[in-house]
Amino acid sequence: MEDKSMFDTIHHIAIIGSDYEKSKHFYVDLLGFEIIRENYRKERDDYKIDLACGEQEIELFIIKDAPARVNYPEALGLRHLAFKVKSVDDTVKKLNAKGIVTEPVRLDDYTGKKMTFFHDPDNLPLEIHE
């Protein structure tokens, strides 16, 4: 089967957070992402933290005065970020044990796989999916 895509894979996803301590604690200490690089950008008065996510990266920008994300009605652009896990049930238990609230586990209508959502400190929806 011929590969028609001009892209190899996703290199990174960029997330904007508003609070350095809360966002770093959430993504590094609670979710377990490894810091690859961390830089304070004086000219912008913000931080950029690059996190390892498998072979991809998450760029976590901390911008104090960034406008709040519009959730309802849904706006154009990125809707949520989904992470593949071996077991949604096991991952939910780990998240809940760390104080992270998750929605009830449900089956994806189209794949039949288990999935659920939770939110980061700035209310970005995050999904786990088998």
Which stretches of residues belong to each language-model region?
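Mid-chain, well-packed structural core segment of small domains
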Residues: 74-89
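A short, acidic/glycine-rich surface segment
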Residues: 36-38, 44-46, 60, 65-71, ...
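Core segments of cupin and vicinal oxygen chelate
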Residues: 16-57
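Short amphipathic alpha-helices within nucleic acid-binding modules
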Residues: 26, 89-94
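Vicinal oxygen chelate
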Residues: 1-6, 92-130
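N-terminal beta-strand motif that seeds the catalytic metal site of vicinal oxygen chelate
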Residues: 1-22, 78-81
